[in-house]
Amino acid sequence: MSSSCSGLSRVLVAVATALVSASSPCPQAWGPPGVQYGQPGRSVKLCCPGVTAGDPVSWFRDGEPKLLQGPDSGLGHELVLAQADSTDEGTYICQTLDGALGGTVTLQLGYPPARPVVSCQAADYENFSCTWSPSQISGLPTRYLTSYRKKTVLGADSQRRSPSTGPWPCPQDPLGAARCVVHGAEFWSQYRINVTEVNPLGASTRLLDVSLQSILRPDPPQGLRVESVPGYPRRLRASWTYPASWPCQPHFLLKFRLQYRPAQHPAWSTVEPAGLEEVITDAVAGLPHAVRVSARDFLDAGTWSTWSPEAWGTPSTGTIPKEIPAWGQLHTQPEVEPQVDSPAPPRPSLQPHPRLLDHRDSVEQVAVLASLGILSFLGLVAGALALGLWLRLRRGGKDGSPKPGFLASVIPVDRRPGAPNL
């Protein structure tokens, strides 16, 4: 295992070394042929690509007849630019002693790479992906080397870890994108992600330890629909499905939260449904409502998903029941003679309309349950006190001889022990 780790590490180091070889004379590993790189404020060496190393050449700027460096400089085929800046960028021409064109070199200035910013996220329990971005812009062509390895804990009381398994390449999907995907991950394992940024001036590595429990973030639910409830002008029914990326297994469940608001209203109302649908009972009649939903692991691992795209729905246009008339008004209204062909109108009911009580049902149920609980508690306390008093009196009645002076006032004098008979 350790041999495979060291082997792949040597391969990665070799690749990085080859990529950074641009700092050597006449590099060809980066960019188009003839482009060489340097850092602002540092000395830069350019080499003539068409001559043998060490052969003296003359250097000119492209389009300028002025000689920058002659063949007697003692620098051979190299041109040295002290403390290069942006004005030094451009194309240079080198000529041999016989005036033949040795080649052209284009100078591009930039900065060495810094450690990239890396973050990882898991959309399910089996796969996770990592993305990265440069912490500073180098201005140079840049490549990234990505790999990962798995770490296992030896014991709960041990702070040491077993040798890491891997590393393995983390394939970039698609190739060249700032994202790599790890397939077939283990939920209870920890992983170390290695992202190395490489450009012609160097390499910099970022290591990130992750666990699926902490980076789990499902995709938002799909298929959100909002429908009116016929005959209920203040109700909406919302339904949705699991995200397609979530595994269809009974022990991997999601919980949901739903938000809704009327049109032109900035504040959202939030509820946590128990399943894959929810009936909104306090919608504003006649107004369209925006609804959105998000998901999270049922055991609160990771974080909530992003919100789903909003879906819109308008409650039913059924008539809202009017207020119940007072008792006196019921008897003072003039009676209308029913027509022969039309059915008799229904008699007014003194009972409140059930729709008017929908929003008060839950409050009344809570009040009734609280009252029953208080009455039950008081009944238990009274029963306990009565039982204790009864047991105390019973023990007192079974006691043998009465205590001195006990009930002495109610015993006749002539029956007291030792009293003379008169």
Swiss-Prot record:
Q: Where is the composition biased (Basic and acidic residues)?
A: 413-422
Against InterPro entries, the record matches this protein to:
FN3_dom, FN3_sf, Hematopoietin_rcpt_L_F3_CS, Ig-like_dom, Ig-like_dom_sf, Ig-like_fold, Ig_sub, IL11/IL27_subunit_beta
Effect ascribed to mutating R355E: Decreases proteolyisis by ADAM10
Give ranges for the Extracellular compartment: 24-370
Please give the biological process terms from Gene Ontology that the record holds. cytokine-mediated signaling pathway; developmental process; embryo implantation; head development; interleukin-11-mediated signaling pathway; positive regulation of cell population proliferation
From which residue to which does the signal peptide run? 1-22
List UniProt keywords, sorted A-Z. Craniosynostosis, Disease variant, Disulfide bond, Glycoprotein, Immunoglobulin domain, Membrane, Receptor, Repeat, Secreted, Signal, Transmembrane, Transmembrane helix
Disordered as annotated region, ranges = 335-355, 398-422
Record has Translocase as a keyword: no
For this chain, the annotated S-S bridges are C48-C94, C120-C130, C170-C180
Q: Name one GO molecular function term.
A: interleukin-11 binding
Task: Report where it is expressed, by tissue.
Answer: Also expressed in normal and malignant prostate epithelial cell lines. Expression levels are increased in prostate carcinoma.
- Under the cellular component aspect of Gene Ontology, which terms does the record hold? external side of plasma membrane; extracellular region; plasma membrane; receptor complex
> Where are the Cytoplasmic topological domains?
392-422
Q: Which residues form a coiled coil?
A: none
For this protein, the parts annotated as crossing the membrane are: 371-391
Q: Where is this motif: WSXWS motif?
A: 304-308
PTM field = A short soluble form is also released from the membrane by proteolysis. The sIL11RA is formed either by limited proteolysis of membrane-bound receptors, a process referred to as ectodomain shedding, or directly secreted from the cells after alternative mRNA splicing. mIL11RA is cleaved by the proteases ADAM10, ELANE and PRTN3.
Where does the record say carbohydrate is attached? N127, N194
Q: Where is the Fibronectin type-III domain?
A: 112-219, 220-317
| Sequence similarity | Belongs to the type I cytokine receptor family. Type 3 subfamily.
Function according to Swiss-Prot or TrEMBL: Receptor for interleukin-11 (IL11). The receptor systems for IL6, LIF, OSM, CNTF, IL11 and CT1 can utilize IL6ST for initiating signal transmission. The IL11/IL11RA/IL6ST complex may be involved in the control of proliferation and/or differentiation of skeletogenic progenitor or other mesenchymal cells. Essential for the normal development of craniofacial bones and teeth. Restricts suture fusion and tooth number.
Q: Which disease is it linked to?
A: Craniosynostosis and dental anomalies: A disorder characterized by craniosynostosis, maxillary hypoplasia, and dental anomalies, including malocclusion, delayed and ectopic tooth eruption, and/or supernumerary teeth. Some patients also display minor digit anomalies, such as syndactyly and/or clinodactyly.
Q: How does it assemble?
A: On IL11 binding, forms a multimer complex with IL6ST/gp130.
Protein name, per record: Interleukin-11 receptor subunit alpha
Q: Which organism is it from?
A: Homo sapiens
Name the gene that codes for it. IL11RA
